[in-house]
Amino acid sequence: MRIELSNAFERLGNVLIYGTQKVYALDAGPEGPNHPNDKYFVVRKVANEQSWNVEQEMVIVVPIKNEKLKLLEGVITGIPHNCLIIVVSNSDRDDVDRFNMEKNVVENICHFSKRDFLIVHQKDPEIAELFESMGYADILGEDGLIRDGKSEGMLIGILLTQLLQKKYIGFIDSDNYFPGSIYE
């Protein structure tokens, strides 16, 4: 991969949030050195092995609510193989259990592609208890469960990433119509 070097970030407490980096090539060709004296050194080559090492320490969180199952399938298949997938669903569980349908799709894909994953429902009482025990009750609604919203689902993903002791995290919308863009 050839990727632009990061040059700016914002600090939010102990977290550094870097700006968007431009990807110039997904395949950078055979292994070769990066030369600091090269006038193009603002673009860094990342070897496949380096990408794989980062992916093994990375979680990709996919928040979803009642999306088409084919879109979810495309998103899951587009995520790099070594990344742990966490799907945080806030889909309906009433007449038609959309969450169970999503779970079946993810289980099927991950079984045949030999991948690890975790899928949780945003309204799971145990997740609400976990947030409350950490002193973060503002995320809870009047019913004592996690409120509706994509940002709440993302916070669940962040918490699970920390509990799993992963180093990196990424977020992908479940309604992504271009699975090939996920790898970027």
Functional labels for PLM-detected ranges:
Residues 89-92:
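Acidic ATP/Mg2+-coordinating residue in the GHKL
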Residues 1-81:
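N-proximal low-complexity "stem/linker" segments adjacent to membrane-targeting elements
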Residues 59, 84, 116-118:
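Proline-centered loop/turn at the N-terminus of a beta-strand
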Residues 181-183:
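Acidic donor-diphosphate engagement hotspot in glycosyltransferases and nucleotidyltransferases
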Residues 96-164:
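Active-site-proximal specificity loops/subdomain of glycosyltransferases
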Residues 86, 118-120, 170-172:
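Hydrophobic/aromatic beta-strand patches that form the interior of the parallel beta-sheet core
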Residues 166-179:
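Short beta-strand-to-loop acidic/aromatic patch adjacent to the donor-nucleotide binding site
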Residues 57, 83-85, 167-168:
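Residues at the starts of beta-strands that form the adenosine-phosphate
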